[in-house]
Amino acid sequence: MKIRPLHDRVIVKRKEVESKSSGGIVLTGSAAGKSTRGEVLAVGHGRVLENGGIKALDVRVGDTIIFNDGYGVKVEKIDNEEVLIMSENDILAIVEK
């Protein structure tokens, strides 16, 4: 199944980020107390402005992004992958390569 986000929405595949506690315990996801990373799989055509114009999105397909855990709406198994749909406003940063 193919999915195409509308307007300023973005389809994201979550990437787990590991970190270690001071005791050497590996923490993942929300237990790490950090933002979550993900890969952008698809983007909408842009945000509709009050004057009817379209503002293109800053994120692109393939970008690695950082967002707070809990943002986005889970969509179960699109092409056997769990993905999130979120607004570009929910994205905190793009990870530069």
UniProtKB/Swiss-Prot annotation:
Quaternary structure and partners: Heptamer of 7 subunits arranged in a ring. Interacts with the chaperonin GroEL.
Gene it is expressed from: groES
Locations listed in the record: Cytoplasm
Molecular function (Gene Ontology), one example: unfolded protein binding
GO cellular component, one term: cytoplasm
Family, as annotated: Belongs to the GroES chaperonin family.
Major subcellular location class: cytoplasm
GO biological process: chaperone cofactor-dependent protein refolding
Protein name (database record): Co-chaperonin GroES
PANTHER family xrefs: 10 KDA HEAT SHOCK PROTEIN, CO-CHAPERONIN GROES
UniProt function note: Together with the chaperonin GroEL, plays an essential role in assisting protein folding. The GroEL-GroES system forms a nano-cage that allows encapsulation of the non-native substrate proteins and provides a physical environment optimized to promote and accelerate protein folding. GroES binds to the apical surface of the GroEL ring, thereby capping the opening of the GroEL channel.
Keywords, alphabetical: Chaperone, Cytoplasm
Native species: Blochmanniella floridana
Gene3D superfamilies in UniProt: GroES chaperonin
